[in-house]
Amino acid sequence: VICCSWSWWLNHQHLLPEPEQLIAAMLPIASLEDPLTAARVESLKRQGRDWFRTLLLPEALATLIPAIASLRRGGGRLAILDGRVRGRSWGEQVLRALEPWEALQRLLPD
């Protein structure tokens, strides 16, 4: 069992055996507490644009897809615990990006 950040996983996954299961507590959505992210969001707000769907969500998906590539190749399971995927309107976009997928009834081991 490895508990790590998305950035750690992206930088080190090639050094580890392919996982059978990856459990993501939260999606890799950039924090507004990061000054660069906050400035970019503020710029989009001033332009009247949807800063979440224009910036944060695409960046999160661009992080997520390569982060799970080895899992997909090996036929492993991805469990996303982030309730926002089911509870927010943008969750469908996340699920579409992960297709094909199916809901898990339980986590490993079976």
Predicted features along the sequence, with ranges:
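Conserved RecA-like P-loop NTPase helicase motor core
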Residues: 2-88
